[in-house]
C-alpha cells in the first residue's frame, strides 16, 4: 500500500474524533475559548440536546476580520507561539484544533467584533468543503459561535448520540464544573428556549458561597470546611466536606489545576487516601479544590481533551494534597478532640475569690457551657462563611481577665495583631524550613459568643492592674497556664495559680516534636511515601535496620530490605515527611548501630525519639504570640499529665515581688 499525506479535511475529521466526542465536548471547547478571550458574560443556547444547535455568545476581546478565516484553520491559535509557551501554559486552549475539528463535522458560523472594529464580520463553513465565506453583520463587541446539525455528515457518529435528555445532562454537568472554576464570570444556559441555569458573577465570599450552594447543594455547604494552604510554590484552596457530608456516589468531586478542570489519578489517589480512615468503602468524599503551581512544573499537553496532567514533582504534589486534607479532617469538629486541661487558651469555669481591693470575680463569671464551647473548638480549618462572625471579637485590644479576677495588661499591639491574623481566614502558609503548623479553630456562633464574653472586661482604673506571685512560688509548677505575652522573641510569659512563669519556646518545640515521635504508648501511624525511597548503605547499617525493624515500625518508619547493602523506605510518620530522608535515615541507622548495646535503646524507644527530635525540631529565632500559643497548646495535648515541668530549660518561675515593690 502506498503511503500518502492525508487531505486536510480528512485529517480534521480524524482529529474531530478525539476532540468532538459529543455535544458537551463542543460546548467545552467553545466556552474555554470564551474564557481565554477574557469574557465576563457567556450565554449558551442549546436545542435538541446540542444535536440541532449549540450557540455560544460572549463579551470577550473578539477576533479581527483578517483572522476569522485563519481561526477556522487547523493548528491556528493566538495562545502559544514558541516551545517555551508550550512548557508554561496558562490558557485553557492551546492546540488550535477545536474550531477546525468542530467545523468539519457541522455547519459552523463564527461571528465576531473586537473593540478596534466598528463593523462585525461573520465566517461560515460547512462540513468537508472547509471553504470559509465572510460577510458583514451586526454584532456587539465579543464573539458568537453557532454549531448547527452536529455530525450531519458522519451518520455513524450521530447514531451513537444518546437521547436529548442525556446529552443535555452532560452539558449541564460540564457547565457546573466551569461555573466553579470562574466565579467572576456570569453564565446563562438555555435549552429549547428555556432558561435552565443562571450563574451570576460572584465578586465576594458570600456570592461565591451562593454559587457553590447552587452547584453543589445546601447539604454540601452545611458540612464544608474551607481550605487555604501554601507550601513551596504549591497553593491549595477550596472546600471539602466532613465525613458527615459524604455521598453515596462521586458526583460532587471537582478539582482544578491552574484553573483547568481535571480528572487526574494522582490527585484522586491523594484525596482518597486522606479520607481512608474517615469514610466507609461505599462512601465518597465531596470537594471543590483548586491547585495552583508554577506552569513550568505541570504538563497539560498529555490528554486530547486535557483531562489529565503530568506533574514534574508528582510526589511533592501528592503528599502536599494528602497532608493538607488529612490534617484538616483530623482536626475538624467532626472528630472528637483530646480533652484540654488548663492551657494557653482555656479559662477555668470556677470563679476565683478576688483579693481585697480588686473588683469582684463574679463580674467576669462565664457559664460552664461557654467554656465547653471553647474547649471543643476544632483546631483547623475555618468553616467557610464565618469571616463576618469573627469581626465582633475585637475586645482583645482591652485587657483580659486573669484567673484571680484581676486584669493583666494586654500583649503588645503587634503580637495582638498577629494573634488576630492567625484566627482570620487568610492563607495558612507552611515554609520549607519550619514544621507544619495548623490553623486556629473555626468557631461556631456559640464559640464566637464565648470568646467575646471571655475577652470583654470593664474599664477599671489602672491601679487595679496587678500580678501577685503566690507565697509558694518556689513549689513545682503544675501547669503551663494562660499566655500573656512573648518576651525577647523566644520566651512566653504565662500566668498560673502559682504565679507567673517563662517558657522557652525553643525547648517547647523540642518537647512537642518528641511527643509526636514517641511511640512508647502506641505505635505511630506510618504515612506511605508515594515513591518509596531507595538507599544504598553500608552492610552494618542495613543490619541495624533489620535488627531494630520492630522498633522502627513502632515509630512509623517502615523499611523493605532489598539486599545486604540496600533497602527501601516505604513510610515515615508525619513529623518526618518534610525532612531530607536521604540524609536523615542513614544517620538514624548509624545512631541505632552505635547505641545497640546500650540498655536505654534496648528497653524503649525514648532515646531514639530524643535523637530524632533534636534533629527534626525546627527552632526559630523569634515567635509571634499566636505561634507560641499553638506550640504550648499542642505540647499540653501530647504530654497531658506528664508534662516535663521538671526541666528548668523549659519553664521557670518569675517573681515580680521586687518590681511591684518599686512601683508601690
Swiss-Prot record:
This protein's UniProt keywords: DNA damage, DNA repair
Presence of keyword Transferase: no
Compositionally biased tracts (Polar residues): 427-436
Gene Ontology MF terms: ATP binding; ATP hydrolysis activity; ATP-dependent DNA damage sensor activity; mismatched DNA binding
GO BP, one annotated term: mismatch repair
PROSITE patterns associated with the record: DNA_MISMATCH_REPAIR_1
GO cellular component, as recorded: mismatch repair complex
Annotated region (Disordered), positions in chain: 382-447
Short name of one Pfam family: HATPase_c_3
Functional note: This protein is involved in the repair of mismatches in DNA. It is required for dam-dependent methyl-directed DNA mismatch repair. May act as a 'molecular matchmaker', a protein that promotes the formation of a stable complex between two or more DNA-binding proteins in an ATP-dependent manner without itself being part of a final effector complex.
Assigned protein family: Belongs to the DNA mismatch repair MutL/HexB family.
Listed PANTHER family: DNA MISMATCH REPAIR PROTEIN MLH, PMS, MUTL, DNA MISMATCH REPAIR PROTEIN MLH1
HAMAP family on file: DNA_mis_repair (MF_00149)
Name listed for the protein in its UniProt record: DNA mismatch repair protein MutL
Amino acid at each position: 500500500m502506498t503511503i500518502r499525506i492525508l487531505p486536510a479535511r480528512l485529517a480534521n475529521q480524524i482529529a474531530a474524533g478525539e476532540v468532538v466526542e459529543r455535544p458537551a465536548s463542543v460546548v467545552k471547547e467553545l466556552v474555554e475559548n470564551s474564557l481565554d478571550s477574557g469574557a465576563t458574560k457567556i450565554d449558551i443556547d442549546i436545542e435538541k440536546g446540542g444535536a440541532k444547535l449549540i450557540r455560544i455568545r460572549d463579551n470577550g476581546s473578539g477576533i479581527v476580520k483578517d483572522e476569522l478565516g485563519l481561526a477556522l484553520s487547523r493548528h491556528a491559535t493566538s495562545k502559544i507561539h514558541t516551545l517555551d509557551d508550550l512548557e508554561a501554559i496558562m490558557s485553557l486552549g492551546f492546540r488550535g484544533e477545536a474550531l477546525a475539528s468542530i467545523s468539519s463535522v457541522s455547519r459552523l458560523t463564527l461571528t465576531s467584533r473586537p473593540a478596534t472594529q466598528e463593523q462585525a464580520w461573520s465566517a461560515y463553513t460547512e462540513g468537508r468543503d472547509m471553504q470559509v465565506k465572510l460577510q458583514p453583520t451586526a454584532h456587539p463587541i465579543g464573539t458568537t459561535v453557532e454549531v448547527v446539525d452536529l455530525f450531519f455528515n458522519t451518520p455513524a457518529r450521530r447514531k451513537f448520540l444518546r437521547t436529548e435528555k442525556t446529552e443535555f445532562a452532560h452539558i449541564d454537568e460540564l457547565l457546573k464544573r466551569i461555573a466553579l472554576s470562574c466565579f467572576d464570570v456570569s453564565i446563562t444556559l438555555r435549552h429549547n428556549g428555556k432558561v435552565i441555569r443562571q450563574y451570576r458573577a460572584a465578586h465576594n465570599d458570600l456570592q461565591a458561597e451562593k454559587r457553590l450552594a447552587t452547584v453543589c447543594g445546601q447539604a454540601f455547604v452545611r458540612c464544608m470546611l474551607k481550605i487555604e494552604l501554601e507550601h513551596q510554590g504549591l497553593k491549595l484552596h477550596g472546600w471539602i466536606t466532613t465525613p458527615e457530608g459524604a455521598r453515596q456516589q462521586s458526583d460532587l468531586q471537582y478539582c482544578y489545576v491552574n484553573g483547568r478542570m481535571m480528572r487526574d489519578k494522582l490527585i484522586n489517589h491523594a484525596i482518597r487516601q486522606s479520607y481512608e480512615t474517615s469514610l466507609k468503602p461505599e462512601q465518597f468524599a465531596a470537594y471543590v479544590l483548586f491547585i495552583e503551581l508554577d506552569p513550568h512544573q505541570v504538563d497539560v499537553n498529555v490528554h486530547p481533551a486535557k483531562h489529565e496532567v503530568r506533574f514534574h514533582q508528582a510526589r511533592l504534589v501528592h503528599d502536599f494534597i494528602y497532608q493538607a486534607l488529612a490534617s484538616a479532617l483530623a482536626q475538624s469538629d467532626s472528630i472528637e478532640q483530646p480533652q484540654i486541661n488548663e492551657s494557653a487558651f482555656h479559662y477555668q469555669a470556677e470563679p476565683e475569690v478576688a483579693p481585697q481591693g480588686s473588683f469582684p470575680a463574679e463580674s467576669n463569671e462565664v457559664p460552664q457551657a461557654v467554656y465547653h464551647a471553647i474547649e471543643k473548638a476544632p483546631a483547623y480549618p475555618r468553616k467557610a462563611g464565618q469571616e463576618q462572625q469573627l469581626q465582633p471579637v475585637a475586645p482583645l485590644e482591652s485587657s483580659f481577665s486573669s484567673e484571680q479576677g484581676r486584669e493583666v495588661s494586654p500583649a503588645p499591639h503587634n503580637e495582638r495583631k498577629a494573634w488576630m491574623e492567625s484566627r482570620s481566614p487568610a492563607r495558612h502558609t507552611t515554609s520549607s524550613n519550619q514544621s507544619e503548623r495548623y490553623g486556629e479553630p473555626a468557631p461556631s456562633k456559640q464559640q464566637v459568643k464565648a470568646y467575646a464574653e471571655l475577652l470583654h472586661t470593664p474599664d477599671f482604673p489602672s491601679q487595679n492592674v496587678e500580678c501577685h506571685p503566690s507565697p509558694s512560688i518556689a513549689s513545682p509548677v503544675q501547669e503551663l497556664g494562660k499566655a500573656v505575652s512573648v518576651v525577647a522573641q523566644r520566651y512566653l510569659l504565662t500566668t498560673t495559680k502559682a504565679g507567673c512563669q517563662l517558657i522557652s519556646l525553643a525547648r517547647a518545640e523540642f518537647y512537642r516534636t518528641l511527643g509526636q515521635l514517641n511511640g512508647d504508648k502506641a505505635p505511630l501511624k506510618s504515612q506511605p511515601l508515594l515513591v518509596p525511597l531507595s538507599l544504598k548503605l553500608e552492610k552494618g547499617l542495613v543490619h541495624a535496620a533489620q535488627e531494630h525493624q520492630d522498633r522502627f515500625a513502632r515509630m512509623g518508619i517502615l523499611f523493605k530490605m532489598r539486599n545486604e547493602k540496600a533497602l527501601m523506605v516505604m513510610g515515615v510518620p508525619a513529623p518526618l515527611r518534610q525532612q531530607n530522608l536521604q540524609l536523615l535515615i542513614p544517620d538514624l541507622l548509624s545512631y541505632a548501630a552505635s547505641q545497640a548495646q546500650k540498655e536505654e535503646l534496648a528497653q524503649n524507644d525514648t532515646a531514639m525519639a530524643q535523637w530524632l527530635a533534636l534533629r527534626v525540631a525546627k527552632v526559630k529565632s523569634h515567635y509571634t504570640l499566636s505561634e507560641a500559643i499553638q506550640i504550648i497548646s499542642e505540647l499540653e495535648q501530647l504530654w497531658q499529665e506528664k508534662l516535663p515541668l521538671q526541666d528548668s530549660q523549659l519553664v521557670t518561675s518569675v517573681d515580680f515581688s521586687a518590681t511591684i515593690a518599686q512601683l508601690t
